C-alpha cells in the first residue's frame, strides 16, 4: 500500500497543506522546529487515530482553530481508499471510503504505518510501559478484535480498581461485586495475553534473521513475553483463565489492602535477549540499537504476513541516530518494497541510490515546497 496524497487543515503549525506522493521514497528536508515531524505525525495519526507524541489531542489542533483535519488517499492492491480524520475538542471522527466509522477501532487498520523515531531506540532500554504500548499499537493495526478486547480490559480494570479502593476505605463491605468484576477481567485479560503471546512469537520469527544479518551472524535475538502467569499453551484461553483465577484468589486480600489490581496484562513486559543475555541490562548501546532496528524492520514483514500488504514506513530524524552500517542495512532492507518517508536536516547522510529514486520536499515554517 502507499499514500497517493495528503491534505492537512489546521494541523499543528500547518494552516493548510496539500501533497502528492509519486515516489516510493519521499525525503522531507528542513531545519528543526519547522514542521517535519508534524508532517510525519499527521500520516501516523491518519493511520492510528492517535499521536505517538502526545495523548492530548488538543495539541494537534492549530492555535485558535476549532478542529484539525487530515485527509489522504491510500492505494491498495484492490483499489484506492479515501480516508479522513477530524480532530475537534469534542473528540475524533474517522471516515473510510466516505463512510463514517462508529468506533475508532473500526477505523484503524485501513492504513498501516510503522513509525521509527529517535525515541523508539528507547524501546529496549525504556520502561515496561513503553513496550506494552508498542505491543498494543502494533497488534491493533492488524486486529480490530484486539483493540476491542484491550479497551474492554482497561474499562473493567478501572472499575475493579475503583471498587478495590472502596473496599480499602471500608466504604464497601460486600465483596460480591469484586468477584463479578474479577471474572469479567479474567475473560478479557486472557484474550489480550493470548494475542500478545502470539504476536511476540511472530515478531521473533521475523526479527531473528534481520538481527543476525546486522550483527554479521554473531548474535541471536530472542524475545520473551514476561508475565507472572503459567502459560504452557498460549492458545488455550481456558488454561490462561484458570491461571488468572488462581492468582487472583491468592492476591485478593493484598489487593483489598492496597486498593489496586496487582496482576494482569497491564503489569506485563517483553524481554529481549542477545545470545541469552538480557539486552536491557547487559547489552551495549550498539546491541540495544540493533535490537530496536531489528524489531521495527520485522514489523514490515509481520504486517505483510497478516494482511498481504506492506505498510508505510516513517523514518523521523532517525537516520542520523544510526551509524553508517545500520543505516545502510535499513535502507537496503526496505528498498523497492515499502513506501518510505524520511525527515532530515540535510541529505548528506543519505546514500546516493536512495536520493536518486526519492521525491524531495522542503518544509519551512509550516509550508511545504516540492
UniProtKB/Swiss-Prot annotation:
Question: Which GO cellular component terms are attached?
Answer: cytoplasm
- What name has this protein been given in UniProt? DNA replication and repair protein RecF
State where ATP binds: 30-37
Q: Where in the cell is it found?
A: Cytoplasm
Domain of life, source organism: Bacteria
Q: What is its main location?
A: cytoplasm
Q: Which GO terms describe its molecular function?
A: ATP binding; single-stranded DNA binding
Q: Which PANTHER family has this protein been placed in?
A: DNA REPLICATION AND REPAIR PROTEIN RECF
Looking at the keywords, is ATP-binding present? yes
Amino acid at each position: 500500500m502507499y499514500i497517493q496524497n495528503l491534505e492537512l487543515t489546521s494541523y499543528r503549525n500547518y494552516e493548510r497543506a496539500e501533497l502528492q506522493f509519486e515516489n516510493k521514497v519521499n525525503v522531507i528536508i528542513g531545519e528543526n522546529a519547522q514542521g517535519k515531524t508534524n508532517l510525519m505525525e499527521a500520516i501516523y495519526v491518519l493511520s492510528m487515530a492517535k499521536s505517538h507524541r502526545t495523548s492530548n489531542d488538543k495539541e494537534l489542533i492549530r492555535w485558535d482553530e476549532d478542529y484539525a483535519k487530515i485527509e489522504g488517499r491510500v492505494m491498495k492492491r484492490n483499489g484506492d481508499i479515501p480516508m479522513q480524520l477530524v480532530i475537534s475538542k469534542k473528540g475524533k471522527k474517522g471516515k473510510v471510503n466516505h463512510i463514517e466509522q462508529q468506533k475508532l477501532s473500526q477505523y484503524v487498520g485501513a492504513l498501516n504505518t510503522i513509525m521509527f523515531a529517535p525515541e523508539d531506540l528507547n524501546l529496549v532500554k525504556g520502561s515496561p510501559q513503553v513496550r506494552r504500548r508498542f505491543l498494543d499499537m502494533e497488534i491493533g493495526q492488524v486486529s480490530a478484535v484486539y483493540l476491542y478486547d484491550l479497551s474492554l480490559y482497561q474499562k473493567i480494570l478501572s472499575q475493579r480498581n475503583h471498587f478495590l479502593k472502596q473496599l480499602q476505605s471500608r466504604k464497601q463491605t460486600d465483596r460480591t461485586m469484586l468477584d463479578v468484576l474479577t471474572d469479567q477481567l479474567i475473560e478479557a485479560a486472557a484474550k489480550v495475553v493470548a494475542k500478545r503471546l502470539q504476536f511476540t512469537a511472530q515478531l521473533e520469527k521475523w526479527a531473528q534473521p534481520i538481527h543476525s544479518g546486522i550483527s554479521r551472524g554473531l548474535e541471536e535475538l530472542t524475545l520473551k513475553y514476561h508475565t507472572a502467569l503459567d502459560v504452557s499453551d498460549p492458545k488455550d484461553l481456558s488454561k490462561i483463565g484458570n491461571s488468572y483465577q488462581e492468582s487472583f484468589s491468592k492476591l485478593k486480600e493484598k489487593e483489598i489492602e492496597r486498593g489496586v489490581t496487582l496482576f494482569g496484562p497491564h503489569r506485563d513486559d517483553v524481554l529481549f535477549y542477545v545470545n541469552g543475555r538480557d539486552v536491557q541490562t547487559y547489552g551495549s548501546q550498539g546491541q540495544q540499537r540493533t535490537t530496536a532496528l531489528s524489531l521495527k524492520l520485522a514489523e514490515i514483514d509481520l504486517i505483510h504476513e497478516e494482511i498481504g500488504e506492506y505498510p508505510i514506513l516513517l523514518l523521523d530524524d532517525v537516520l542520523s541516530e544510526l551509524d553508517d552500517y545500520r543505516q545502510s542495512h535499513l535502507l537496503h532492507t526496505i528498498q523497492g518494497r515499502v513506501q518510505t518517508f524520511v525527515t532530515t536536516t540535510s541529505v548528506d547522510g543519505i546514500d546516493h541510490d536512495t536520493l536518486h529514486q526519492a521525491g524531495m520536499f522542503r518544509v519551512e515554517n509550516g509550508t511545504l515546497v516540492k
